[in-house]
């Protein structure tokens, strides 16, 4: 290690120490141990443009070990991103650009929100998938307009999480050679020595999953690190894991190599002793020697800007030779849709009857005909979820151009990979599974919502109507649970036209994910136009079948498959001179964003007798039914029997709805 390298690594370490000390909060051990690998990667290999952090063909970097955020912030500052010393001093403070864990969209240069361990690796896999698909789709002859690498730094905790195995298995199967993961192997976890809980042979595990595994014995050896990354970059047929042996809290005389340095500041005295161990002679905290700034300016900033300029020149020529492809790619990068994107979306007529999963399959195929960068897949349930794009090919290790992704029985990895694909940009992505298994990918949905990613989830088999498979496969609490998640839009459509509307809203999203909750059983098409359905779904709730009188005797509020039931019950109640209005409420979150005036139009304040009908938990419906209303829901688990039998046994029948309304009115 030469003098400038040594000084640069020491600067990264001391900046991280100082930020954590000032905040009196954070994780110094990982940045202190992993600083040399981050330095080597960023100054010798990473192509990034600090002045334009969103440059499309930049290398992607995911700090899967997100608790080491001080390391990333130090790298971003030194590299010339919009992150000042004052920002580093604001580490973990209210309103700062340097939150405790990296947040996408909050800090320039952060490519993914990380912190929940394991998900960063899986998002990096998604980014590598996106790079390969876009490269295969748009690269032509000598024009490699998409050809970057995806890098990640992870720790022991990441590799203990199950999602890392799911994602690594998928990456190896797909031969994602441009994915390189540096493993900060320091033999320490938060609770103590790693051998208390983790003793497997990581090398053999990853080799069994078709990864190349390299080993760096000394994590402080820049030459050794450089050679390993160079070798990894040469392997186009396998992703690479580079195990780098490090010492957590390197340089700390009393805490290096212990769990005590993982998640607590060093303290004033230990910080002083540690800096002395680095031969750091500067008294001032947050000090950066001018020669270190100059070194990073050349190695990262100027190098990256040159690469971006070369890419811009190449893309300008590409536009001349392949104008249509270039226009398409530019549209995809901007996240915009083609002008006629919804022209092939089907319209459903009264009299037809189709499961919403089936109409969803038709709609997504209509969208795929007009949106060339619309891609997705399923966690081994494509036939049931109806997520296959016809005549679009499969994304495989031998053909990355296919638009159908086979995630296998890896729901969590699918969710996180979709996040990575969305973060990468250039694609509109969706993924499907049974609604009950949304719990398997919930942490990835949460990160999608937190990052504001327009991912679409196709959740089918949405209720006890699943039938014979029984309570393990019948969702009950999932609707209420996902509705509680901020910035996730959940839509449960009542028929084909509402399903088409839901998809239209989902693909137009730019700042939130959407969960489509769809039936296995057929649903009758409601007597309204597709335009009326779109207008209603867009507002989250609307009167789908009016009462005869201006003020009804009662309101029936339902979602999904229960809207048809409510309309049937309305007709029966009319025979007994009970006049009710039926409200379809496919999306509570959308309805909550409407004006008070509109809400009162749909749910008149003077109509107190209200019955909500939904084959799921009653939790949350009280807000709309009020103290004088009632909920026909399910607050126990399902059962194994034919679907119609269970539906009737649980009270979702016209006679029971009629009786419940009568009971309300007679209260």
Swiss-Prot record:
This enzyme's EC code(s) = 2.2.1.1
Q: Which Pfam families match?
A: Transket_pyr, Transketolase_C_1, Transketolase_N
Residues reported in the UniProt entry to bind Mg(2+): 156, 186, 188
Catalytic residues at: 411 (proton donor)
Give the catalysed reaction(s), semicolon-separated: D-sedoheptulose 7-phosphate + D-glyceraldehyde 3-phosphate = aldehydo-D-ribose 5-phosphate + D-xylulose 5-phosphate
Task: Please provide the record's keywords in A-Z order.
Answer: Calcium, Magnesium, Metal-binding, Thiamine pyrophosphate, Transferase
User: What cofactor does this chain's UniProt record say it requires?
Assistant: Mg(2+); Ca(2+); Mn(2+); Co(2+)
- Residue positions annotated to bind substrate are 27, 262, 357, 384, 461, 469, 520
Is Calcium found in the keyword set?
yes
What PROSITE patterns does its record include? TRANSKETOLASE_1, TRANSKETOLASE_2
**Stored SUPFAM superfamilies:** Thiamin diphosphate-binding fold (THDP-binding), TK C-terminal domain-like
Keyword Magnesium part of the UniProt annotation: yes
GO CC terms in record: cytosol
Family, similarity comment: Belongs to the transketolase family.
Q: What does this protein do?
A: Catalyzes the transfer of a two-carbon ketol group from a ketose donor to an aldose acceptor, via a covalent intermediate with the cofactor thiamine pyrophosphate.
Q: What is the protein name for this chain?
A: Transketolase
Q: Which species is the source of this protein? A: Bacillus subtilis (strain 168)
